[in-house]
């Protein structure tokens, strides 16, 4: 792989995530109307601009259910449903309407599973929609039962109403059923409060009493109601050290294994007795491994009169994963640090992600 910088990167596998475009040559030749995004325009019955000509599948353009904006959806599930709708409409005369698709997908990446549904933060930014997001790290089932696997969930939602916009999940086990739950709530115009009410089948080998989806809802509710004020990794990374006080509330043993540069370690259990060590004229950023203890520290500080406090969303786990250096090893053994490429890309937008 040859970069613009002139450097060459040896690789055994290259993944091209470049997207696709609808093949509409036949539709154009037939004089059918195309939409703003280049797909075949269809109405709610999936009928094109020409009477009695219908279109389904990857090439059609249809308003997104959440925004009403033109949308292209390249997924097999909606295409099959569209085929059934068109069959009914051709036989019975446009009696069935298509509701649109929010875009729910899943993929296997070696041992991991990645899944997405609805509108991610990047898309919301592109469309100028205000939103809030949260990141939670959970286990696929009860931690005391063997073989629980890590799972990370990010959701986006309306910061006022709590309406759920989208979700992304990365993990190893149980990702599929969680993304399906998020998709169902989004499709029915649900909110983060609905995530808190979802009733899942529970037994230790399959889930936790507080399921990862419910936990994501609880954290989002804390944000909306003001129980916590999150800071996101991009924000925290770009704040100059002299303007922030980094408070690591993990145990000393955890702290000894590494922390954020310049962080001060005050374990959560000692925090109430060491409040005098904290500044009140500087923003304090609390953090722990995944977010829970950082949240508890935030609550303790605000209840003791500290009004300049924010908690790192997703904790140190999220920050480290997002800011990890990109080291490329060449065939001659030289190592190249390509981290600035990551930073440049990440800083193109200033809104929290």
Question: What is the predicted role of each segment?
Answer:
Residues 88, 92, 184, 299-303:
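Short, well-ordered alpha-helices that flank and scaffold nucleotide-derived cofactor binding pockets
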Residues 193-204, 208-245, 252-285, 289-353:
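Rhodanese-like catalytic fold shared by cysteine-dependent sulfurtransferases
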Residues 57, 247-249:
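Active-site flanking residues adjacent to catalytic metal/cofactor-binding acidic residues
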Residues 2, 7-88, 185:
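FAD-site-proximal beta/loop scaffold in flavoenzymes
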Residues 173-191:
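A short, polar/charged loop-to-alpha-helix boundary motif
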Residues 59-173, 204, 208, 212-238, ...:
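Mid-to-C-terminal Rossmann-like scaffold of FAD/NAD(P)H-dependent oxidoreductases
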Residues 20, 61, 161, 251, ...:
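Short, glycine/acidic-enriched loop or turn micro-motifs at the edges of active sites
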Residues 155, 182-183, 236, 284:
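Generic hydrophobic alpha-helical segments
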């Amino acid at each position: 792989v040859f970069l613009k910088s002139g450097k060459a990167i040896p690789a055994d596998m290259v993944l091209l995530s470049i997207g696709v475009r609808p093949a509409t040559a036949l539709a154009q030749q037939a004089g059918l109307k195309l939409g703003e995004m280049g797909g075949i325009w269809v109405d709610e019955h999936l009928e094109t601009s020409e009477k009695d000509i219908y279109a389904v599948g990857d090439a059609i353009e249809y308003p997104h259910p959440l925004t009403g904006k033109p949308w292209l959806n390249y997924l097999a599930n909606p295409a099959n449903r569209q085929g059934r709708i068109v069959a009914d409409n051709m036989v019975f005369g446009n009696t069935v309407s298509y509701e649109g698709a929010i875009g729910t997908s899943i993929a296997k990446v070696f041992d991991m599973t990645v899944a997405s549904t609805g509108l991610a933060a990047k898309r919301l930014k592109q469309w100028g929609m205000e939103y809030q997001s949260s990141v939670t790290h959970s286990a696929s089932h009860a931690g005391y039962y063997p073989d629980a696997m890590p799972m990370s969930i990010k959701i986006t939602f309306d910061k006022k109403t709590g309406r759920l916009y989208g979700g992304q999940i990365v993990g190893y086990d149980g990702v599929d059923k969680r993304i399906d739950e998020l998709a169902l709530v989004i499709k029915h115009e649900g909110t983060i409060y609905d995530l808190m009410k979802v009733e899942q089948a529970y037994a230790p080998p399959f889930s936790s009493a507080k399921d990862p989806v419910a936990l994501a809802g609880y954290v989002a509710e804390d944000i909306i109601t003001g129980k916590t004020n999150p800071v996101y990794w991009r924000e925290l990374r770009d704040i100059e050290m002299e303007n922030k006080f980094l408070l690591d509330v993990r145990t000393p043993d955890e702290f000894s294994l590494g922390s954020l540069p310049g962080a001060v370690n005050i374990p959560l259990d000692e925090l109430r007795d060491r409040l005098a060590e904290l500044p009140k004229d500087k923003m304090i950023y609390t953090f722990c491994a995944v977010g829970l203890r950082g949240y508890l520290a935030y609550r303790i500080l605000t209840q003791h009169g500290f009004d300049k406090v924010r908690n790192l969303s997703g904790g140190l786990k999220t920050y480290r994963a997002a800011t990890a250096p990109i080291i490329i090893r060449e065939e001659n053994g030289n190592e190249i640090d390509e981290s600035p490429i990551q930073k440049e890309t990440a800083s193109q937008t200033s809104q929290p992600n």
